[in-house]
């Protein structure tokens, strides 16, 4: 990483201020070239005229910040240019930066990649930063901040340090098995007890289920039922906008319509599906119903809407919702947990939202999960499996195999933090960041 990179760190629309980030060994010379002066005092905003070094033309009067490494986001010498936010100003400065020797435009995620490679962040913190950028609800923000602050990273580092000590003892016992000063029985008692504690802690973290992963993805609520049960009307009422076409003609909804919403700080994905009936459907509607059944199977919660004239039996586990209460008929809401609502008047919607929020909260938690990605889960499961084999085989397996399981357990924890075996994944992860991050 000998080159110096630059990129806008703010949005591209018209704004009061536009920020450009610079990172790398040429950051100081870049400031000197633009301002005609040495870098200002570190970590202070300083007003400077920015000029094109080739022509002397004034580009902008801007606030500049000089951030000498390694105590920076990337771990390198860095600088920021706080420009007036017009598109022409930003474009002119970027054009001049691109002509300076040794400078190159940053790829998406390039600044964060440098922070990771320079040891400023581990991989769990990088993933937390990505989740924070994508967070749409309070619970997602809270979970992302915990990861960014090192909730999982600190645990993994502590577990890894413990296992490295156990492994060192096991390897010493192997290397010096003929020496009398190596207490193999003490290693077996204390070392394997420590390994068991780490394994139990990992299993406890995994016992949370997939709450962290599901919180990132959202709680999927599928609106299902017979045609003309009021699914699209309910979707529009919950979304507070006309997301779906509403028509008295059966079969209007042919494909699933998805709407993301924030429900009590939790991410919820509402899915309006094609109405289900046994006969009279054309081929297109039949395909829509097949897709509806697949979405029902994949849902976290199914709201089974029943119109006043009734309909088919609800799938197992579905929340039955009697619709069109405004027509004045008594659907018997409240029996066996069923609800009665009117999407037109709003009657019963608050109670329905409370039920959905309770189900989402039970499934997702409130951002306190430690494991938030499938990659993390798989590595921790692998570590626990190796530790389980080492502990179970301590008395029966050859010592070399026990030590090998300990080595593989340490390696699996290293993968969680990004120390080993993550090269291919890094490109995918960093490409999901915006330019300038």
From Swiss-Prot:
PROSITE patterns attached to this UniProt entry: G_TRME (PS51709)
Record keywords, A-Z: Cytoplasm, GTP-binding, Hydrolase, Magnesium, Metal-binding, Nucleotide-binding, Potassium, tRNA processing
EC number: 3.6.-.-
Binding site for K(+): 228, 247, 249, 252
Entry binding sites for Mg(2+): 232, 253
Residues that coordinate or bind GTP: 228-233, 247-253, 272-275
Compartments, as annotated in UniProt: Cytoplasm
Keyword Cytoplasm: yes
Any one GO molecular function term: metal ion binding
Entry's Gene Ontology BP terms: tRNA methylation; tRNA wobble uridine modification
A Pfam family this chain is assigned to: TrmE_N
Chief place where the protein resides: cytoplasm
One annotated Gene Ontology cellular component of this protein: cytoplasm
NCBIfam families: PRK05291.1-3 (NF003661), small_GTP (TIGR00231)
Family stated for the protein in its record: Belongs to the TRAFAC class TrmE-Era-EngA-EngB-Septin-like GTPase superfamily. TrmE GTPase family.
Subunit record text: Homodimer. Heterotetramer of two MnmE and two MnmG subunits.
Function: Exhibits a very high intrinsic GTPase hydrolysis rate. Involved in the addition of a carboxymethylaminomethyl (cmnm) group at the wobble position (U34) of certain tRNAs, forming tRNA-cmnm(5)s(2)U34.
Protein name as catalogued: tRNA modification GTPase MnmE
Species assigned in the record: Methylobacterium sp. (strain 4-46)
